[in-house]
A protein has these predicted regions:
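Short, well-ordered beta-strand segments enriched in hydrophobic/aromatic residues
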Residues: 18-30
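Low-complexity, acidic Ser/Thr/Pro/Gly-rich terminal tails and inter-domain linkers that flank the onset
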Residues: 1-17, 52-65
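Internal interaction segment
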Residues: 102-129
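The feature marks short-to-medium sequence segments in extracytoplasmic or secretory-pathway proteins
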Residues: 34-71
Length: 129
C-alpha cells in the first residue's frame, strides 16, 4: 500500500502510473431531498478489471468521508466532487467494475459495472444521483 501524508504526495505516484484515479460527482435526489441527506464511501470499495476476480482496494478517498463518517449536504442542489485512488490496474485493462458492495441493490451505493477505461482516463467524473 502507498502511504503518504498529503494529497500532493500522491501526484508522484499518479505520474508514475502507480495509482488509478477515479473522479466522481454526487448530489442529493432533488425529489426526495430532506435535511440531513448525507454521503460517504465504504472503506472496502474496490475496482476490478472486467472478467477477473482481482480486487484492488481503496488507497485514498479525497473530499469524501469513509464510513462511518458522513458528509451532510447543505441543500438539495449542492454537488460533491470527490476522487478515489486505487492501485494501478494491469496493463491492457479496457473496462473495470467499481464495487462498493458486491451483489447489493441497495440504493446509494457506488456500484458501476463495465466502465470503459477511456472514460476513467478522460477525467470526466462518474455521476450517481
Amino acid at each position: 500500500m502507498i502511504r503518504t501524508e498529503t494529497i500532493e504526495e500522491f501526484e508522484t505516484h499518479i505520474e508514475e502510473g502507480e495509482l488509478t484515479v477515479i473522479h466522481f460527482i454526487t448530489r442529493p435526489n432533488i425529489v426526495n431531498y430532506t435535511i440531513g441527506w448525507w454521503v460517504n464511501v465504504i472503506g472496502s470499495i474496490f475496482i476490478r478489471p472486467c472478467g477477473t476476480k482481482d480486487k484492488l482496494g481503496l488507497v485514498l478517498a479525497h473530499n469524501i468521508p469513509v464510513a462511518p463518517a458522513k458528509y451532510y449536504f447543505k441543500n438539495a442542489h449542492e454537488q460533491l466532487h470527490f476522487t478515489l485512488f486505487f492501485p494501478a490496474l494491469p496493463k491492457g485493462t479496457t473496462h473495470i467494475d467499481i464495487v462498493e458492495e458486491e451483489g447489493s441493490n441497495r440504493i446509494g451505493l457506488y456500484n458501476f459495472y463495465r466502465v470503459p477505461m477511456s472514460k476513467i482516463n478522460s477525467g470526466v467524473p462518474l455521476q450517481r444521483h
